[in-house]
Amino acid sequence: MHFRRERTRRRRVLDAARGMPARSLDAARAAPARGRELRKAAAQLDIPWARSWLAGLIRENFMRFVLNPLMDYYAARRASGREKLEDVKGPVILVANHASHLDTPVILSALPRKLRKRTVVAAAADYFYKNRVVAWLVSLIFNTVPVERRRGGGMSKNGGHLDVLLDQGWNLLLYPEGTRSRDGMPGPLRRGAAVLAAAHHLTIVPIRVTGTAEAMPPGRFWPRRRRDKPVPGRHRIEVSFGEPITATGDADEVMEYVKTFFQSGSVSPYRSPYRRRATAGSPN
């Protein structure tokens, strides 16, 4: 009986997180209140135990003995710009381009251990928290926190449970596109990261990831090896850290800088730079 009541409560919370259609005459007027309601609903889906010392110990060992060897089988990973993080004082907001479910473990593994242990990852409440078992798994393995990404539930100066986590000293990894790219180019960036950083006087660290879409494109739930050679090989994945940004100015300007960094690696930032070099160096 207790399980049934809990399941009913979770369903109601998810319904609120997804949002119900508002009447057209009241939609604009109700948007701020609706945003607060959705952020509150997302907070109720949170699993605080995932941030306990025991969960952190499990997570670090899982990263070391399971995730890293698994990623090494499918991809040759490289991180650049880590020296830019040496003088960064937490908490910080990490913003990255998004093309694959592989992005999160790749980014977390590239972070210095001290920074990684205090980093939470914003995850879509309507995607990762619909099923309680999935929610527990992603929260434990990646230290995720639920965020409502639709219909007025985006972040604002009052980000709800995200404000609390930042005040507690947690770093926050965000994907400002709100979803994975389907066409190989970054989509429009939402302003939430810059607004949240300015409200808390925090630094933003832009992160560019290349190669993950080839290893694990949208639609796949497991990585694959390269098949452009007789013997399947590893993909080339690179994580590049940009110059930290002080988000005290215009949010749109800050996010435009971030988008420029995402695009600075190539015409298509989600394609492996190693493959581009090989193509450029091959005879016509």
Could you say what each language-model-derived stretch is?
Residues 120-126:
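Short internal beta-strands
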Residues 156-164:
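TIR-domain catalytic/interaction hotspot
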Residues 1-106, 117-119, 130-133, 140-143, ...:
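Membrane-anchoring hydrophobic helices of lipid-metabolizing enzymes
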Residues 117, 133-139, 170-171, 182-253:
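A cross-family acyltransferase "interaction/gating" segment
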Residues 73-80, 156, 187, 222-224:
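Short gly/ser/thr-rich secondary-structure transition/capping motifs
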Residues 113-115:
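Short helix-capping segments at alpha-helix termini
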Residues 79-80, 145-149, 247:
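Short acidic-hydrophobic, aromatic-tinged amphipathic segments that line or gate anion-handling sites
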Residues 91-93, 169-175:
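Residue-level preference for the first positions of well-ordered beta-strands
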